[in-house]
C-alpha cells in the first residue's frame, strides 16, 4: 500500500519535522565566551534550577523510553518536571517519523535509544567536593560516535543531525564553567563525559524492539499475527504496522453519511417499486409474455440488490462494514458474505435480463422466431448462480477500503465472474438496441406524420433499455477509470501520511475517486427499481392488470372502491385474466368471450413489446405475426378466468 520506491524523496520531507524535534532544547544558546575548546570537547551552560530526577514514565497505552534509558531514576530535568512531559510529546512525534522511515533506514531501534538519550539525558550531580558552594545538576550529551552510527544507518537523518557540532554531540565530554559554585581546577571548567547508549542498547535490544507509533486516525496492529493479517480485513501501510481506519478517510464523515442516507432512501423506494412490478407483471397478470417475464425477473433482481442495502442499514453501515476498529468486513463475517452474495447475484442477473429484453425487442422488430424462452430463464439463472459460487469458494467477498457494501474485491475474481461476462452481455444488448433503432428509423420514414401512434408505442421500451443500459455502462466506465487510477491513489498515500505528521489540525484525506462520480455510481445501482416502476408500473397496461385482478375484485374490496369512486370498473378492459361483472346467461358469456377476444388484441397494442401494432394506410408497412410472443410461453386462455 505504501509505495516505498516512488515515495522515498517525499519521505525525506518528514525530516523537516525532525529538524525541529531534534534540536537539543535543553542547551539554550550555548556560548563558549571565546574559550578555545580542546578537540573532542563541547561546552554547556549551567542551569541552577535543573535537577536530577526520575523519568516520569511512559503512559500505559504508549511505550516510549522506559526500556531505552540507561537509568530511568537519574534523568536531567531543567526548570521543572513539566519539561519531561513536553519532551515526551516530542519523542512521540519523532518515533512516528521514524516509523515511516523503515523502508529507507536500518538500525532504527538504536536510533530510538539515541533519541531517548537526547531528550532524557543521564544526569550528573556534582558532589560538594567538586562544587563546595552548591551542588549542581549537569546533563550528559550524546556522544558523537552514537550520532554518527544513527546517521550512517539512516542517511536521511544526516539532514537533521549535525554530528560534527561538538556543542551538541561531543566526542569525549562537555565542559561546564563551575567557578561560581566553587570549582577552581582546570580554570573552573568541569568535564562531564558524553553518554553512549551502545551498552544500554546491547543489553536491552532483545527485550526492547523498535517502537512504531501511528498518527491518529491510523491504528497499530501486529501484521505478523494471523489474527491481524490483511486477509482478515486490515489494510497496512507497508512497511509499517499502521493500518487505515475504517471507514477509509477518502471523504469527509459528512459526505459518507450523505451517501448512507441516499442509499437508505433510494434502496427502500426501489425495493417497494420492484415488489409492485413483480406482483403486477408476475403474479396478478395471468396473460404471460416474454416481456412480462423480463420485467418480472429484472425487478426480482433489483429486489435482491436492494435487500442487500436494507439488511446493511438495518444492521448499520459502519457496524457491518467495519466490525472492529481498523478492520474491514470480509466474507468470514457472515453479514458481509451474505449481503455481498445477494448484491452480486442481483446485479449479475439484472444485466442478463436487460440483455434478454434487448434481444426480444430486436427479434420482434426483425420478425425472428427465438428458441424456447425457457432457455433464457435457465441460462440467466444458472449463470448468475455460478458467478456467485466461484467467488464464494475463493473468499473474495469483502467490504474494501471505501464502499457502501460488501462485494468481490479480488481483481481476478471480479473480472472473471462479473466484468467480463456482463461486459459481453451488455455489448450484445447494445448491438440489439442499435439495430432496433435502425429498424425504427427505416419504418418511420414511411409513417405519416399524422399517424405517430406506432412511434409513441416504442417510447417506453426504448426509454427503459436506454436508461438502464446507460446506467450499467456508467458502472463499467467508472470501475475501469477507478482501476486505472488505483496506482496513483496508492502513491498518494504518502501525502496523506505527511498531512498526518504535519499536525496542522486540518482534516487529512486520502486520494480517491471524485466524490460526485462515486455518489452517482451508487445512485444508479439503486435507481433501477424506480426506473422500471416509472416506465412500466404506471402504464395503462399495469392499471388494467390491477383492475382485472382478483384483489380489487374481491367481494370485500370492490364495493369499497365503487362506493368512493376510486376505480371506474365500468370503463375497464376485459381480457383473459379479468373478472366480468355481467350476468351469467349463456348469451352474456358468448358476448364476453367475443369481447375478450377483441380486448386481447387491444391489450396487445398496449403491451410493452416493440412491434408495429397497426397497418399504416396507403402502402405503409404491415404488422408481423402478433402471436410470436406467445410461442415460447404458455399463453393465457382467451376466455375469462371466471
Swiss-Prot record:
Keywords: Coiled coil, Disulfide bond, Glycoprotein, Membrane, Receptor, Signal, Transmembrane, Transmembrane helix. Residues 578-642 are annotated as: Disordered. The chain crosses the membrane at residues 265-285, 295-315, 345-365, 376-398, 417-437, 461-481, 515-535. Induction: Down-regulated by phagocytic stimuli and growth on bacteria. GO terms for molecular function: transmembrane signaling receptor activity. InterPro entries: Frizzled/Smoothened_7TM, Frizzled_dom_sf, GPCR_2-like_7TM, GPCR_Fz/Smo-like. Residues 47-197 form the FZ domain. Residues 1-26 form the signal peptide. It is a multi-pass membrane protein. GO terms for cellular component: membrane. Glycans are attached at residues 80, 153, 162, 177, 203, 222, 261, 482. The keyword Transmembrane applies. This is Frizzled and smoothened-like protein B. It comes from Dictyostelium discoideum. The lineage of its organism: Eukaryota, Amoebozoa, Evosea, Eumycetozoa, Dictyostelia. The gene is fslB.
Amino acid at each position: 500500500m505504501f509505495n516505498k520506491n516512488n515515495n522515498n524523496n517525499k519521505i525525506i520531507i518528514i525530516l523537516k519535522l525532525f529538524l525541529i524535534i531534534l534540536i537539543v532544547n535543553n542547551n539554550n544558546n550555548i556560548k563558549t565566551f571565546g574559550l578555545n575548546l580542546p578537540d573532542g570537547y563541547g561546552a554547556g551552560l549551567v542551569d541552577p534550577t535543573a535537577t536530577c530526577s526520575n523519568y516520569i514514565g511512559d503512559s500505559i497505552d504508549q511505550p516510549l523510553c522506559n526500556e531505552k534509558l540507561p537509568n530511568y531514576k537519574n534523568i536531567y530535568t531543567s526548570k521543572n518536571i513539566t519539561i519531561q512531559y513536553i519532551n515526551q510529546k516530542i519523542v512521540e512525534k519523532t518515533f512516528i517519523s521514524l516509523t515511516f522511515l523503515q523502508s529507507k533506514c536500518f538500525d532504527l531501534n538504536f536510533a530510538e535509544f539515541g533519541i531517548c538519550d537526547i531528550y532524557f539525558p543521564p544526569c550528573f550531580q556534582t558532589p560538594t567536593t567538586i562544587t563546595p558552594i552548591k551542588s549542581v545538576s549537569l546533563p550528559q550529551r550524546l556522544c558523537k560516535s552514537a550520532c554518527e552510527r544513527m546517521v550512517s544507518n539512516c542517511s536521511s537523518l544526516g539532514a537533521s543531525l549535525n554530528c560534527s557540532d561538538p556543542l551538541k554531540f561531543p566526542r569525549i565530554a562537555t565542559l561546564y564553567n563551575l567557578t561560581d559554585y566553587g570549582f577552581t581546577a582546570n580554570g573552573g571548567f568541569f568535564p562531564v563525559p558524553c553518554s553512549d547508549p551502545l551498552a544500554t542498547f546491547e543489553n536491552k535490544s532483545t527485550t526492547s524492539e523498535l517502537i512504531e507509533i501511528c498518527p491518529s486516525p491510523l491504528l497499530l496492529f501486529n501484521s505478523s499475527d494471523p489474527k491481524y493479517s490483511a486477509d482478515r480485513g486490515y489494510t497496512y501501510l507497508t512497511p509499517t504496522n499502521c493500518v487505515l481506519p475504517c471507514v477509509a478517510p477518502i471523504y469527509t464523515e459528512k459526505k459518507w453519511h450523505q451517501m448512507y442516507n441516499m442509499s437508505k432512501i433510494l434502496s427502500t423506494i426501489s425495493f417497494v417499486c420492484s415488489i409492485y412490478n413483480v406482483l403486477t407483471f408476475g403474479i396478478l397478470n395471468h396473460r404471460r409474455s416474454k416481456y412480462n417475464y423480463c420485467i418480472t425477473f429484472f425487478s426480482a433482481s433489483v429486489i435482491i440488490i436492494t435487500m442487500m442495502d436494507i439488511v446493511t442499514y438495518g444492521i448499520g453501515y459502519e457496524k457491518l462494514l467495519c466490525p472492529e476498529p481498523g478492520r474491514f468486513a470480509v466474507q468470514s463475517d457472515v453479514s458481509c458474505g451474505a449481503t455481498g452474495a445477494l448484491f452480486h447475484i442481483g446485479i449479475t442477473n439484472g444485466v442478463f435480463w436487460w440483455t434478454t429484453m434487448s434481444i426480444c425487442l430486436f427479434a420482434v422488430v426483425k420478425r425472428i422466431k427465438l428458441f424456447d424462452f425457457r432457455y433464457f430463464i435457465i441460462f440467466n439463472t444458472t449463470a448468475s448462480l455460478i458467478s456467485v459460487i466461484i467467488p464464494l469458494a475463493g473468499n473474495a467477498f469483502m467490504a474494501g477500503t471505501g464502499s457502501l457494501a460488501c462485494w468481490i474485491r479480488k481483481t481476478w475474481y471480479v473480472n472473471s465472474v462479473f466484468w467480463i461476462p456482463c461486459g459481453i452481455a451488455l455489448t450484445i444488448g447494445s448491438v440489439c438496441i442499435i439495430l432496433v433503432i435502425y429498424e425504427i428509423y427505416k419504418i418511420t420514414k414511411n409513417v405519416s406524420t399524422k399517424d405517430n401512434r406506432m412511434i409513441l408505442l416504442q417510447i417506453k421500451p426504448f426509454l427503459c433499455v436506454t436508461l438502464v443500459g446507460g446506467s450499467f455502462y456508467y458502472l463499467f466506465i467508472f470501475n475501469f477509470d477507478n482501476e486505472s487510477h488505483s496506482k496513483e491513489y496508492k502513491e498518494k498515500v504518502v501525502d496523506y501520511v505527511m498531512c498526518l505528521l504535519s499536525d496542522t489540525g486540518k482534516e487529512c484525506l486520502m486520494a480517491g475517486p471524485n466524490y460526485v462520480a462515486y455518489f452517482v455510481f451508487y445512485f444508479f445501482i439503486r435507481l433501477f427499481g424506480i426506473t422500471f416502476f416509472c416506465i412500466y408500473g404506471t402504464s395503462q397496461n399495469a392499471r388494467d392488470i390491477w383492475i382485472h385482478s382478483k384483489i380489487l375484485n374481491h367481494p370485500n374490496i370492490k364495493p369499497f372502491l365503487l362506493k368512493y369512486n376510486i376505480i371506474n370498473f365500468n370503463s375497464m378492459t376485459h381480457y383473459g385474466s379479468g373478472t366480468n361483472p355481467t350476468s351469467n346467461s349463456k348469451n352474456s358469456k358468448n358476448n364476453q368471450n367475443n369481447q375478450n377476444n377483441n380486448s386481447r388484441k387491444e391489450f396487445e397494442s398496449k403491451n410493452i413489446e416493440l412491434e408495429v401494432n397497426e397497418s399504416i394506410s396507403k402502402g405503409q408497412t404491415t404488422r408481423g405475426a402478433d402471436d410470436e410472443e406467445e410461442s415460447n410461453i404458455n399463453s393465457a386462455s382467451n376466455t375469462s378466468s371466471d
